Amino acid sequence: MGVKIGINQIKKDMFIVHDGQPYRVLDYDHVKPGKGQAFVRVKAKNMKTGNVIEITYKSSESIELADFEQRQMSYSYFDGDSYWFIDMNTGDMIAVPASVLGDEAQFLKEGMEVFIFLDKGQPIGVELPKSAVYEVIETEPGFKGDTATSTLKPAKIDTGATVQVPLFINEGDKIKIDTRTGKYIERVNE
């Protein structure tokens, strides 16, 4: 049984238990209607199935925090079915099924340090750094003076993922991407 907290203490990226299943809080909203009791609406991702649901709690309720083992590891390689990570302290390797990573897999780079969440030794989640730097390997050429517009174009980055970038970004440029949303943050001069 995990630790219980008041629902008003909930934060983004917390791990909670709902109906006996582990969930990660993606977003939450404290709602105070004109009439009636205040409540908290929580958007959460099931760590085992990947399904995203919305849960409503009364503001007086408490929730159970999920009790997971968290290990910092480094991404090594993909074997076609699983992503392999190495524990930098022990040298242990862990295989994480592609279904556990979902869309985040497109932003994995060799050597990237991540957190792996384990439930009774089984990987149930991976947390990438909030942002990372990637090289643009394919995009339409930019033009001088294209900096004042908010128009975006597709660009393929070195992991193979396609992201939307401003018009002034060229092949070979290094860009910072938000790994949670896939959105362009800024051009990086290294």
Curated annotation (Swiss-Prot):
Compartment(s) where it occurs, according to its Swiss-Prot or TrEMBL record: Cytoplasm
Pathway involvement of the protein, from the record: Protein biosynthesis; polypeptide chain elongation
SUPFAM superfamilies: Nucleic acid-binding proteins, Translation proteins SH3-like domain
Cytoplasm among keywords: yes
CDD domains: S1_EF-P_repeat_1, S1_EF-P_repeat_2
Top-level taxon in the UniProt lineage: Bacteria
Family under the similarity heading: Belongs to the elongation factor P family.
Name of protein: Elongation factor P
Source organism (scientific name): Persephonella marina (strain DSM 14350 / EX-H1)
